[in-house]
């Protein structure tokens, strides 16, 4: 996924189908410098993690 698209999704609070390693996630925040996104899995909202934006796939 492109950094700018991920950032727009996080800022708008859009719930758009985004996949990370085959599981659906929600983007909470994007760190421009590190090109990382703070996400949580839709089936495990308590499990947050930082992942590389380039590995996110919009469905």
Swiss-Prot record:
One of its GO terms (cellular component) is endospore-forming forespore. The keyword Iron-sulfur does not apply. GO terms for biological process: asexual sporulation; sporulation resulting in formation of a cellular spore. Induction: Expressed only in the forespore compartment of sporulating cells. InterPro entries: SASP_SspH. Its main location: other. Keywords: Sporulation. The keyword Cell inner membrane does not apply. It comes from the Bacteria. It is found in: Spore core. NCBIfam families: SASP_H (TIGR02861). Belongs to the SspH family. This is Small, acid-soluble spore protein H 2.
